[in-house]
Amino acid sequence: MIQKITSHIFHLCRGQVFQIEGYRIFAMGGAESHDKARRKEGVSWWREELPTEAEVQRARAALECVNWKVDIVLTHSLSTKIQWELFHGMLSYTENRLTDFFQELDENLDFRLWFSGHYHFSKQFDERHVLLYDTIVQLTEGGFRKCFPVEK
């Protein structure tokens, strides 16, 4: 399901595969808040921040339908291993059931590029994993190109 937010902004719902502009895109939102002790439930923190087991199973079923092959992966956080390599086990970014699911995807999914945005900085981690924060990219045949940083 796609929810239209504005004429140029769309919400790709969790655990689904989309065909957009010739790209097969898998989207899986969610991340664990590392600062939830400072947040208020229902105002700045929601229990639904992590996908349910049913949502993860629907995601697996959607990937089965495309033989575990997509062009682009869009997530908020990254796999347990990459998160560990980025932050060297900092307590604020701990392993959880979602990062473990992303680890499973990283090891088994055939994909070209994986974009995430949870970590509040932009960086190309390796040839396939890209963290985006204040950067907009355009997909190209060979991968992607940075268009411009978002002005603050």
Model-predicted segments: where are they?
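Short acidic-hydrophobic surface loop/beta-edge motif
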Residues: Q3, R14-E21, Q124-D126
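Active-site-proximal loop/helix segment associated with metal-binding centers of metalloenzymes
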Residues: S7, I20-N96
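A conserved beta-strand/loop element that lines the FAD pocket in flavoprotein oxidoreductases
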Residues: H8-C13, L131-L132
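Conserved beta-sheet core of the metallophosphoesterase superfamily
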Residues: T80-E151
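A generic local structural motif
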Residues: L12-C13, Q57-A62, T99-Q103
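A structural motif corresponding to the C-terminal end of an alpha-helix
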Residues: K4-I9, C65-D71, E104-L113
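Active-site metal-binding loops of divalent metal-dependent hydrolases
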Residues: G15-Q16, G29-E32, S77-L78, G117-Y119, ...
